[in-house]
Amino acid sequence: MRKLLKFGHSMTAITFLGSVVVLWVFHQQLPAPSDALEVYSAQRSAMERVASLVLIPSLLISLLFGLASMAAVPGFHGAPWAWGKLVTTVLMLEGSLLGIQSPIKREAELAVAAMTDGDLVGELAQKLAAEQWSLILIGLVATANVALGVWRPRFRSRATPAS
């Protein structure tokens, strides 16, 4: 059971980080909406699908595998690194919902609307830098989360000599 939980947790973590990278690549390839609105809209729709169908579900399933592992393995109950992973996962979930998935979804909807209403083109691509920074920060937190699971630091304070 323990190996199955670890395997599931590892696979979903790989999927999550992979989807962050895919979204980053899409961001780097976005054309200016005023130059190629159809391409911009298509890419934004693809990004929305990646965020909704891969990024968020993989993170939620990874969280469930991690919680199940914490419940099933008594050694994880008091391990500071395990609690650190839980905290970083909650940060990743909130950051992914608020900083990645929601803005991508809004922009995809706006891009589709701009296809029929040309006046909306000027409202597109206003927050690209914020989305890119969200991807970078969430990617770094996810990397720290993986590092905690791999190296499992003890976080023990050094004993002070008795006087």
Predicted regions and their residues:
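Polytopic transmembrane helical bundles with strong interfacial aromatic enrichment
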Residues: 1-163
